[in-house]
């Protein structure tokens, strides 16, 4: 952004769907064109009486450009589960500049580490994967990767290759286990369900880097919200028994969330830029 001159336009293509209140960060940017992909996201940013400074002049509902390729390369009936939690600001080291952080010496004492490490080592999880013939891929957040050596990764769990595209990971998986991450929208775009493991939901928004927005996980989510491992594994088996096809309210949410699933998001963005809305 620092290299944009006053005569140049800043077109914010985005890398994901905004579900939380990021107004404090985004309001500091001079954005001329703001791309969104769901009606709820668009309304939360462009409508009057919200926390954002942007309006219908800047914000457009076109769909994300990269979703065209995501849709095109999707693999149906992929027998892979991704475990992809986000991070917590209070369990990692302080920022040292650029994208690096110091290491937190007591990381393994955190509830975050203990809960996810227990899940990865669950005998029931392993048996479910064997019974239904699924593989598990663990994809930790970049801020958690420095602590990967602390996790006890069993042989049946693969570690995602961080040199490969995340889009490939989404396309080649049938189900996601996360906590609060917006990557759940990527799976939903591909009509794939999500399980939200929220063992620390009461403190999450008090200690993290952003504020809760319009999205309600239990009402708007793309799969069940659970608070303990036992419930998670029960919900997982329910979905595996159904070949990872979403059902009920979760299918309704997936079907109604995105404005476009037609492979023409790039075309719409191009036209908006060319004809200046």
Model-derived regions: residue spans:
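A short beta-strand/loop micro-motif in the catalytic core of glycosyltransferases
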Residues: 32-39, 135-137, 176-177
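Donor nucleotide-activated moiety binding/catalytic core segment of transferases
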Residues: 137, 142-185
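Active-site and donor-binding regions of nucleotide-sugar-utilizing enzymes
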Residues: 1-70
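Conserved catalytic-core segment of nucleotide-activated headgroup transferases in glycan assembly
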Residues: 65-150, 226
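Structural alpha-helical scaffold elements that stabilize or flank donor/cofactor-binding regions
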Residues: 3, 27, 128, 168-169
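C-terminal alpha-helical cap of glycosyltransferases
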Residues: 261-277
